C-alpha cells in the first residue's frame, strides 16, 4: 500500500506507481467483449491509440425494432485505502466519486441514481464489529443527502471473514444516469495542448 502522507520522495512515487490499485486494467478488460449488442458508445480505452482508460461505461439503451440516441452512463467509486481508515469517509468518497465520473463522461447528476455493493467482515456476535457497516451506511446516506441522489438498490454481504482474515470495509457506489449518445465525453486529450 502506498503512503498517504505529504512527502514527495522517489520512494513515495515508486510505491504509488507499483500499487495494485493504480496498475493497468487492460488484461482484465480484454477478457470481456464490450461490443456485445452493438450499442457501445464508449469503449473501455479511448484515444487514437486506445491507451486512455475511460472513467465510465456508456451504451445506447437496447430497443426492439427501433433505434435511440439515449445512452445509459454508469461509473463506480471506491477507495480501499480511505475505506480501511474510515468506512464513513470511504463511503462518502465512493458516492461522490461515482457521480463525478458519470458527470465527467457527460451524464446528468440531476438524473442520477445509485446502487451499492457492500462487503464487510462477519460480526461474529461482537457489537463493535457492527460499527464498520453502520458508519459506512451513515457516510453513504450523508453523501446521498448532500448530492441529492438516492440509492435505489444494493447488495450486501457480511461474510467477509475466513478464519482470522477479514476483508477491508467495502462500500462500492455505482452511479447510473442517461445522456444523449452524441454528448458522451471520453477521457483522452482532444487536441495538442489540451488541459
Model-predicted regions and their roles:
Residues 1-195:
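Glycine/proline-enriched, intrinsically flexible loops and inter-domain linkers
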Amino acid at each position: 500500500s502506498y503512503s498517504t502522507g505529504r512527502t514527495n520522495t522517489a520512494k513515495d512515487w515508486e510505491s504509488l506507481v507499483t500499487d495494485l490499485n493504480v496498475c493497468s486494467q487492460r488484461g482484465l478488460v480484454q477478457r470481456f467483449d464490450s461490443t456485445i449488442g452493438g450499442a457501445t458508445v464508449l469503449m473501455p480505452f479511448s484515444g487514437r491509440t486506445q491507451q486512455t482508460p475511460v472513467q465510465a461505461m456508456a451504451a445506447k439503451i437496447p430497443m426492439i425494432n427501433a433505434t435511440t440516441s439515449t445512452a445509459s452512463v454508469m461509473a463506480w467509486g471506491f477507495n480501499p485505502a480511505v475505506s480501511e481508515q474510515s468506512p464513513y469517509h470511504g463511503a462518502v468518497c465512493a458516492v461522490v466519486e461515482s457521480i463525478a465520473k458519470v458527470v465527467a463522461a457527460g451524464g446528468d447528476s440531476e438524473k442520477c441514481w445509485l446502487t451499492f455493493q457492500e462487503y464487510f467482515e462477519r460480526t461474529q456476535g461482537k457489537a463493535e464489529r457492527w460499527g464498520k457497516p453502520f458508519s459506512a451506511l451513515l457516510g453513504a446516506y450523508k453523501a446521498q443527502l448532500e448530492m441529492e441522489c438516492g440509492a435505489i438498490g444494493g447488495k450486501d454481504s457480511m461474510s467477509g471473514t475466513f478464519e482470522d482474515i477479514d476483508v477491508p470495509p467495502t462500500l462500492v457506489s455505482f452511479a447510473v444516469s442517461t445522456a444523449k449518445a452524441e454528448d458522451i465525453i471520453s477521457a483522452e486529450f482532444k487536441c495538442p495542448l489540451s488541459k
